[in-house]
Amino acid sequence: MAKYTVFLTEPEALDVDIVGKEAHQLHLLLENAVRVPDGFVVTADTLHDFLETSGAGAKLAHLFSADLPEERGLEIISRQAVETVLGSEMSWDIEAGIIGAYEHLARQQSVGAPKVSVPVSVAFHPDRFPYFADTFERRATVHDRHDLDKAVKEAWASLYTPESLRFFNSIGWDLEDVRASVLVQHNIAPEASGVAFTVPDEEGGHDMMIKAVLGSAMALEKGIVEPDTYRVD
């Protein structure tokens, strides 16, 4: 059976082309002894296999065989593409691989049915384009194994929302350029959360900018609250 999943602790999680940017960064945090909730990745190759075995890939290729149309037409194509992904059956071996990884995660957590978040983790092949996490709809929350295959397909389908298509079109989008994995990670209730990123400083180097909020970072991602902001030399 093909390997459809990679745990964040496994060496394969170093490969952005397999696990996507977000999962790769989580693996690096683990390597540096930073505490990260347990999880695994449904690999980018799994999406390729799903599209091929379900017939969805041929339907999507037909939809995107011409240049993307104007706004109204784009909305129609987007809806058809999303429906194609969500309406296609996942093969038994792919579903079994994903459920098997979830059950292994449950044993790690000593929990019968761990609550997990299921965002998409994208890499552009072969590193031609920047990565913008906020472009994609994300983070379904699953409470047991029965909804997991649906959540994974929803993550894949987020590649074909109008927002995603506009972004891809703006950077010279091609179907073959996009490789998307799905991160399945134990969902915890944080006391505080946030994001950290680098920004140029006045001397030509980089400082670290940290934006933090109480509770979940979802409020920060959606712009609902004003974060505490710190700049570190």
Roles of regions detected by a PLM:
Residues 1-183, 190-192:
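N-terminal beta-alpha lobe that positions the nucleotide/phosphoryl donor
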Residues 107, 204, 229-231:
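Low-complexity, compositionally biased segments
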Residues 120-124, 137, 186, 195-216:
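Short beta-strand elements
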Residues 129-130, 195, 219-224:
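Short conserved micro-motifs at the rims of enzyme active sites and ligand-binding pockets
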Residues 211-233:
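Conserved catalytic alpha/beta cores of large enzymes that bind or transform nucleotide phosphates
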